[in-house]
């Protein structure tokens, strides 16, 4: 029967109580990228501001709009390195000055102190489900922005809990079947029409709200089976549904262009390294981070082509013509119900246990030398090594006239670099710092290619067959009429009821790898975490290669000899001055009686340098000095090797002298070339596997999969036996109305009508109220500690120390016959100073003596006065890049911030490329019988009486 009129609109009920926070809605499509802004001015080098006093942590302000990316300033020509100035006396530490102004971009307030964890509130009643949102029009793809540097790694999101599965909807009532009408007269048989071209699939409109169902009208008489009407057009797009609950606040926008680095200030004095701290236990695992933002929804694949049509069925027996019934009103074709929502994905299984660590791989190939960085600050002076044993003195020279004390010469060239100290033990793990503010979310990556079509599901079981109707009297077979014209466009069908929720389908085949996403913009730098305690001293790495000797300094001019002054404090050792003229050789005096050892005289001024003595015996290796804490100094130039000296004859061994006073600690020498990488560290102990965390909340529903291919038409029914036409008889009188015959077979479908226009997008709904934030989950149990990283390369050697001040000159002993070294005698009276001897040829290097035991670490000497600044050395070859150090422990993750306001929905992206055509689907179940068409008009009555019959046979005679 016809559908009744729609009832009046009901009065809206009172608003319900706010429901619990719903699942996050599907992310909107990426909007088009706006035009590129004008380039900003190049940044200026900011002055180094003085360190200000730490202010109170301010509240986090709103993220400012992202400025246009400025043109990177051109790098200035590096200036020539000036001569190093004289180090001034360390002044008293001044108070910290006010903080300098901060350059662009906009400032971001420091992270506030995390508040106390609130108690989770009771969940509110479930809110009403919002209407489905309208599908936005596909916008043009935005231009690809410039790739920024990689951002900081985001925190790992917590697992969400799986939501409850919705209840299965109830099935709608079945319509009432009308009374069968009398059969109409048989029409003329028409030719079969050509199959029409399949129309392009229309855009699926959003599902509109269900209108009230009108009362069922009285059933009209059943008419003849007419041609089916043209398919109705799609319904108009429904109004946009209410927006989902407010999502969690997104990360701040990307940071602006970083300003150019300011000029480097003079390095401050090196601090005294503190003692190594105790080894701490493993830190606790941080709180799980919030769920990440879901990726954009991928485009749906194209619909597959329809399958081949089945064979035509044989016509059934014709029924007897009946009286024409009153044509019933055409029923409104209901729109097909929208498919139910996809089933929620179950919670992921627990993570598997970590496998055993594999064997350490071979050391990687040597990388290219990096760009030379700025010289680091001056490192702290290392502790002095133990003085080696005094070498065997050479043969005594001829006694010359007593020379006058000369002035102290200029400072000598720096000595060779001392050996690298042993690496201390591993320090305790520092307490994890506060987690930095998460960086901004990068632009969404390009949509991945649509995955391959999943395997078609099994064919459903056939439905139960209906009850067999009563058999009517067979009517006369009608002649098939010509195909009717295409029907007019049907009215928009009423929206159907919600379909029952389908079961979760089998997972489809994994899609192909999507294109790599665009690199995100660099996030703003997080707040500085609390520095952890100093780590234990690590193991000593292998000794690096000895650095090349530096260039000899300029020799100073010999000044005039002044009158002897009082004994002053020992000064720095000067550079070797030119040798003075040799005085006349005096007559050798008779050996005098051995006198009593006198008290040591005052230290005189340093005399001219003496002749080179014979090489002394190799001393015991000194204790390794403490490793400096400063960064490595600049790499010096590699000097050209000097000429090889002539091989001299070995002199007789002299008596063992008293050990001299230890020299002052010199400044660190230039860094040597980086040594080979150290051996891999021991594999760390595997920690116990923590219990599986609670399942996380259900993520947003994934994008809908591509539509499956249309199933093949069902098999045809059994063909009826054709009847034989009888001879045409004389038309009889019009009989009474017979019993209606059986329902005729379904006629051929007519040509499909034109596709309707796609529905327009409805107005946007109002934004819903922000839901309360969910309770924070308990912190997870700390995971197993990671493997120990490879041992870092040994640090660069310090610069060579300056020579200490010369000690007091010892008394010259009496000359005795060359013999085995005797016990050291008491110091004799000071004799006259002999003339400077000529440098002898260098003797052969003696065999290395056995390594002596390592002595205790000597006490740290007092720092000597700062010497004059030396000339600038030439730039040395670039050193090898050091091996990457151990990775620090992750900081404790802070609580999630308050949820932000929902952003406006952007236009949909452009449709993706068509996916590959899937395999043909399995045969579908046979379709239901079509709706009876409108009965045709009754034909005119035939002529009466009929034509005369043929003459009969002759009668019997």
Swiss-Prot record:
This is Collagen alpha-1(I) chain. It comes from Hippopotamus amphibius (Hippopotamus). Trimers of one alpha 2(I) and two alpha 1(I) chains. Prolines at the third position of the tripeptide repeating unit (G-X-Y) are hydroxylated in some or all of the chains. Residues 45-59, 869-883 have a biased composition (Basic and acidic residues). Forms the fibrils of tendon, ligaments and bones. In bones, the fibrils are mineralized with calcium hydroxyapatite. Keywords: Calcium, Collagen, Extracellular matrix, Hydroxylation, Phosphoprotein, Repeat, Secreted. The modification Phosphoserine is found at residues 87, 579. It is found in: Secreted; Secreted, Extracellular space; Secreted, Extracellular space, Extracellular matrix. Residues 1-957 are annotated as: Disordered. Residues 277-286 have a biased composition (Gly residues). GO terms for cellular component: collagen trimer; extracellular region. The gene is COL1A1. Type I collagen is a member of group I collagen (fibrillar forming collagen). Residues 140-152, 772-782, 818-833, 937-957 have a biased composition (Pro residues). Belongs to the fibrillar collagen family. It comes from the Eukaryota. Pfam families: Collagen. Residues 23-33, 95-113, 125-138, 186-210, 219-228, 330-356, 365-384, 426-453, 488-516, 576-590, 603-618, 649-665, 707-731, 854-868, 902-935 have a biased composition (Low complexity).
């Amino acid at each position: 029967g016809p559908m009744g009129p729609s009832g009046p609109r009901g009065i809206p009920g009172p608003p319900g109580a706010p429901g619990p926070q719903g699942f996050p809605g599907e992310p909107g499509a990426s909007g088009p990228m706006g035009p590129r802004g004008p380039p900003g001015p190049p940044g200026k080098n900011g002055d180094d501001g003085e360190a200000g006093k730490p202010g109170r942590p301010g509240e986090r302000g709103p993220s400012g709009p992202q400025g246009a990316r400025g043109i990177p300033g051109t790098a200035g020509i590096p200036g020539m390195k000036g001569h190093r100035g004289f180090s001034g006396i360390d002044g008293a530490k001044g108070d910290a000055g006010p903080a300098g102004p901060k350059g662009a971009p906009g400032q971001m307030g420091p992270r506030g102190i995390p508040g106390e964890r609130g108690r989770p509130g009771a969940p509110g009643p479930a809110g009403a489900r919002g209407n489905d949102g309208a599908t936005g029009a596909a916008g043009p793809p935005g231009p690809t922005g410039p790739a920024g540097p990689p951002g900081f790694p985001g925190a790992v999101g917590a697992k969400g809990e799986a939501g409850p599965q919705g209840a299965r909807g109830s099935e709608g009532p079945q319509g009432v079947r009308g009374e069968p009408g009398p059969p109409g007269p048989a029409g003329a048989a028409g030719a079969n029409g050509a199959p029409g071209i399949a129309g392009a699939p229309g855009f699926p409109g959003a599902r509109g709200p269900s209108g009230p169902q009108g009362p069922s009208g009285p059933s009209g008489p059943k008419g003849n089976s007419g041609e089916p009407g043209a398919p109705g057009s799609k319904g108009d797009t429904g109004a946009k549904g209410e927006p989902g609950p407010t999502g969690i606040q997104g990360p701040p926008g990307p940071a602006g262009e970083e300003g150019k680095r300011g000029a480097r200030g003079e390095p401050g004095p090196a601090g005294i390294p503190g003692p190594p701290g105790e080894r701490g236990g493993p830190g606790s695992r941080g709180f799980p981070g919030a769920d990440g933002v879901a990726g954009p929804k991928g485009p749906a694949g194209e619909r597959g082509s329809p399958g081949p049509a089945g064979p035509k069925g044989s016509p059934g027996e014709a029924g007897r013509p009946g009286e024409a019934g009153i044509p019933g009103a055409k029923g409104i074709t209901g729109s097909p119900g929208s498919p139910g929502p996809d089933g929620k994905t179950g919670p992921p299984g627990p993570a598997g246990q970590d496998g055993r660590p594999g064997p350490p791989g071979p050391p990687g190939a040597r990388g290219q030398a990096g760009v030379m960085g700025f010289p680091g600050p001056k490192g702290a002076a290392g502790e002095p090594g133990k003085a080696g044993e005094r070498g065997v003195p050479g043969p005594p020279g001829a006694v010359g006239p007593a020379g006058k004390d000369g002035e102290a010469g200029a400072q000598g060239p720096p000595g060779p670099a001392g050996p690298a100290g042993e690496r201390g033990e591993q320090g305790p793990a520092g307490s994890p710092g506060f987690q930095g503010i998460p960086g901004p979310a990068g632009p969404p990556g390009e949509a991945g290619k649509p995955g391959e079509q999943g395997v078609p599901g099994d064919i459903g079981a056939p439905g139960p067959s209906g009850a067999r109707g009563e058999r009517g009297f067979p009517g006369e077979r009608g002649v098939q009429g010509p195909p009717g014209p295409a029907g007019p466009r049907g009215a928009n069908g009423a929206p159907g009821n919600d379909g029952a929720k389908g079961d979760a389908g089998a997972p489809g085949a994994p899609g192909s790898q999507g294109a790599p996403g665009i690199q995100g913009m660099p996030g703003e730098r997080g707040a500085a975490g609390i520095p952890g305690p100093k780590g234990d001293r690590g193991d000593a790495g292998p000794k690096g290669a000895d650095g090349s000797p530096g260039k000899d300094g300029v020799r100073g001019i010999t000044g005039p000899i002044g009158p002897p002054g009082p004994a002053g404090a020992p000064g720095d050792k000067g550079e070797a001055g030119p040798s003075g003229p040799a005085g006349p050789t005096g007559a050798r005096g008779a050996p005098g009686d051995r006198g009593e050892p006198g008290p040591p005289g005052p230290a005189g001024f340093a005399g001219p340098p003496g002749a080179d003595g014979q090489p002394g015996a190799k001393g015991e290796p000194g204790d390794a000095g403490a490793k400096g804490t400063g960064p490595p100094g600049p790499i010096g130039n590699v000097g050209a090797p000097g000429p090889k000296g002539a091989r001299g004859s070995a002199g007789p061994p002299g008596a063992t002298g008293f050990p001299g006073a230890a020299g002052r600690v010199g400044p660190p020498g230039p860094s040597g070339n980086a040594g080979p990488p150290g051996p891999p560290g021991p594999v760390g102990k595997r920690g116990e596997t923590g219990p599986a965390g609670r399942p996380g909340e259900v993520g947003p529903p994934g994008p809908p999969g591509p539509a499956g291919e249309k199933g093949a038409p069902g098999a045809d029914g059994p063909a009826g036996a054709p009847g034989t036409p009888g001879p045409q008889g004389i038309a009889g009188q019009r009989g009474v109305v017979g019993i209606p015959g059986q329902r005729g077979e379904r006629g051929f479908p007519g040509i499909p009508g034109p596709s309707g226009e796609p529905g327009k997008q409805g107005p946007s709904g109002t934004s819903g109220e922000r839901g309360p934030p969910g309770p924070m989950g308990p912190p997870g149990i700390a995971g197993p500690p990671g493997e120990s990283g490879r041992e870092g390369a040994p640090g660069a050697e310090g610069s060579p120390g300056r020579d200490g001040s010369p000690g007091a000159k010892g008394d010259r002993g009496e000359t005795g016959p060359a013999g085995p070294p005797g016990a050291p005698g008491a110091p004799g009276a000071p004799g006259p100073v002999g003339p400077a001897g000529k440098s002898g040829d260098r003797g052969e290097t003696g065999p290395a003596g056995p390594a002596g035991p390592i002595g205790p670490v000597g006490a740290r000497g007092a720092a000597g006065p700062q010497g004059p600044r030396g000339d600038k050395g030439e730039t040395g070859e670039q050193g090898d890049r050091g091996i990457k150090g151990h990775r620090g422990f992750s900081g404790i993750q802070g609580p999630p911030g308050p949820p932000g306001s929902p952003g406006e929905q952007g236009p949909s992206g452009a449709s993706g490329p068509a996916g590959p055509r899937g395999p043909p689907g399995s045969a579908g179940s046979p379709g239901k019988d079509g709706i009876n068409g409108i009965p045709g008009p009754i034909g005119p009555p035939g002529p009466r009486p009929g034509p005369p019959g043929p003459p009969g046979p002759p009668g019997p005679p």
